[in-house]
Regions:
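Alpha-helical scaffold in the C-terminal half of BTB/POZ domains
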Residues: 1-28, 32, 36-190, 226, ...
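Glycine-centered tight turns/hairpins at beta-strand boundaries that repeat
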Residues: 142, 162-176, 196-197, 210-222, ...
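Beta-propeller and closely related beta-sheet repeat lectin domains
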Residues: 181, 203-207, 228, 250-254, ...
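Blade-edge beta-strand/turn elements of extracellular beta-propeller
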Residues: 192-195, 239-243, 284-290, 332-340, ...
Length: 452
């Protein structure tokens, strides 16, 4: 599907515009091939999931994965793509394993992934050249940081992908009742646009970006807490539904860890939840993992260094907002407490910037906060940073281009249409010059590549 989308887009947009400059007679298939390759490189994590990628020939795959401009969040995606491509027609493609692995930058993979995944892969075990590539990667990790330049080849060179312009998607929310409206903010143009509405009203949902799509998970439709999940495709400007969660959840936390979507805590209409479930896009199924130690509704979540954090919230039992924070280790499938925040926060906006966890605003009973604190997993400690310009609870949060954005929310008396962002270098918050068209709290926020 993604390859076809790239071809259609290029044929309708890029190719005709370039042809105006070259002249139709000079417009070659080489230019068309270049444009399509550029699209595939920029959207590789999405492309690698499709049958069209698996049907590419050897030279086409090598051309893609050897490029310094390939857009991937980690080299794991490239390794997984190679394994999938080989398995698609294993009998005829097995002989190409070494040629493909020559372009996978194994030294840039985490050591744990090399040991637990790469070394255990049968296709690697049965190929001497591939085993040599693995040994090279392990040697690279054994060297002190200042000596790693001694192993200098294309596999040790970090990729430098072409960055695509980003837009921010603000999904649903409460204004003052649950709404279907979805707004899109173009950072470059400083402009808000309405995009495809949700299939049904939804506020207090968990919203995340995963593998090229935006997921709206659970929430409240104005009458009931729901377990349904809708997925937004920016290329098509269209929402579709996928498998529902096991439990109804509103005011939940949602995050992505290791290509799995986690739904954390929340409120089912009668009680706060400690349960946690996760969604696999490969099987379109939800399954439970270990529950938290504390029931948490209005909880904020974030992922740092392979761990999932649940921040503050409301437990319903003590009838107090929480300052406690829990950390989930997916390998051990267990939750453990880490350092408490300095203040109780329910409905805090939680986001991750530069490897640190931010908790912005929230409330403690009737007191709505504008204070912000930051957690450093390395020191297991929280510190205060500058206050926001406005008191906010139940706001959406996202990080993009080195800034942390806090979107909407309410100040205790009215829903907010304003957005402000934090600059960690200056320790300063700045209001965006333009507001959303609708003041909304309990909206979800995600950042995606600007649809072409």
């Amino acid at each position: 599907m993604y390859v076809k989308t790239a071809v259609i887009f290029c044929s309708r947009n890029c190719i005709p515009q370039i042809a105006l400059g070259f002249g139709p007679s000079q417009m070659s298939t080489h230019v068309q091939s270049f444009l399509i390759k550029l699209m595939l490189m920029q959207h590789f994590p999405d492309v690698m999931l499709g049958e069209e990628f698996l049907s590419l020939n050897l030279d086409q795959v090598c051309s893609l994965i050897s490029s310094d401009k390939l857009t991937v969040s980690s080299e794991e995606k490239v390794f997984e793509a190679v394994i999938s491509w080989i398995h698609y027609e294993k009998d005829t493609r097995l002989e190409h394993m070494a040629k493909l692995m020559e372009h996978v930058r194994l030294p840039l993979l985490p050591r744990d992934y090399l040991v637990q995944t790469v070394e255990e892969e049968a296709l690697i075990k049965n190929n001497n050249t591939c085993k040599d590539f693995l040994i090279e990667a392990m040697k690279y990790h054994l060297l002190p940081m200042d000596q790693r330049q001694l192993i200098k080849n294309p596999r040790t060179k970090p990729r430098t992908p072409i960055s695509l312009p980003k837009v921010m998607i603000v999904v649903g929310g409460q204004a003052p009742k649950a709404i279907r409206s979805v707004e899109c903010y173009d950072f470059k143009e400083d402009r808000w646009d309405q995009i495809a509405e949700l299939p049904s009203r939804r506020c207090r949902a968990g919203v995340v970006y995963m593998l090229g799509k935006v997921y709206a998970v659970g929430g409240f439709n104005g009458s009931l807490r729901v377990r349904t999940v809708d997925v937004y495709d920016g290329v098509k400007d269209q929402w579709t539904s996928i498998a529902s969660m096991q439990e109804r959840r509103s005011t939940l936390g949602a995050a992505v860890l290791n290509d799995l979507l986690y739904a954390v805590g929340g409120f089912d209409g009668s009680t706060g939840l400690a349960s946690v479930e996760t969604y696999s896009y490969k099987t379109n199924e939800w399954f439970f993992v270990a529950p938290m130690n504390t029931r948490r509704s209005s909880v904020g979540v974030g992922v740092v260094d392979g761990k999932l954090y649940a921040v503050g919230g409301y437990d319903g039992a003590s009838r107090q907002c929480l300052s406690t924070v829990e950390e989930y280790n997916p390998e051990a499938n267990e939750w453990s407490y880490v350092a408490d925040m300095s203040t109780r926060r329910s409905g805090a906006g939680v986001g991750v910037l530069s490897g640190q966890l931010f908790a912005a605003g929230g409330h403690d009973g009737p007191l709505v906060r504008k204070s912000v604190e930051v957690y450093d997993p390395g020191t297991n400690s929280w510190k205060q940073v500058s206050d926001m310009n406005m008191c906010r609870r139940n706001a959406g949060v996202c990080a993009v281009n080195g800034f942390l954005y806090v979107v909407g929310g309410d100040d205790g008396s009215c829903n907010l249409a304003s957005v402000e962002y934090y600059n960690p270098i200056t320790d300063k918050w700045t209001l965006l010059p333009t507001n959303m068209s609708t003041g909304r709290s309990y909206a979800g926020v995600a950042v995606i590549d600007k649809p072409l």
